[in-house]
């Protein structure tokens, strides 16, 4: 695991905390307790108190400096640093990773779906089903649709209960939610895959809405992959 050391002045420690949390796999040191031996760290970031605010310097051989103004700019800087400092380790071949993700989804049936708009967020546990390789949810509605209709952006997680680092397993997905027209053939296929006939819908107390989750990024965390020589964290981006 690549660990990044962050050395910070006391006056700008919140900036260091933001960087450390967003980048991940970081160890933070006040400047007066900075280690003398850097051999155990893959990267180093310094956060100094400048006249106009924090000065963030990232890198050892090649250095890049940021002067973030406020939390939003600090988070943006952290994202850029994370992309440079945290490339995927021991990645799986794409086809093997796709198969692993498919198997994980097939072995589960419930996800936590996060939607949001502005400062409003919602996370809902939902049963999912897969039809012709696509991921769907069926629901009677609710506040999750506030975010779906507002911007369509979703994040979803499927995971096992924690029982030790070696058996740790979870899948985080990012993408868009697409509402399926109840009069479409796609809606019919999803309903029938769920074991419901269209005529039965008329007898239900409330309408069932179908939503397709078009996933653009999968992040799989699977401790068992280490035994195959791969990193536990694998990323599959489809865009």
Model-assigned labels for residue ranges:
Residues 87-111:
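Short, basic/aromatic recognition patches
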Residues 123-125, 132-133, 208, 215:
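Residue-level signal for tight coil/turn positions that link beta-strands
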Residues 42-43, 47-95, 168-239:
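Charged, gly/pro-rich active-site loop segments
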Residues 116, 130-131, 213:
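Generic beta-strand structural signal
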Residues 1-33:
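Short, charged N-terminal beta->alpha structural module
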Residues 103-118, 153-158:
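A short, Trp-centered hydrophobic/proline-enriched beta-strand micro-motif
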Residues 34-39:
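Short amphipathic alpha-helix with an adjacent loop that forms part of the alpha/beta core around
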Residues 129-165:
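A short mixed-secondary-structure module that forms the rim of ligand-binding clefts
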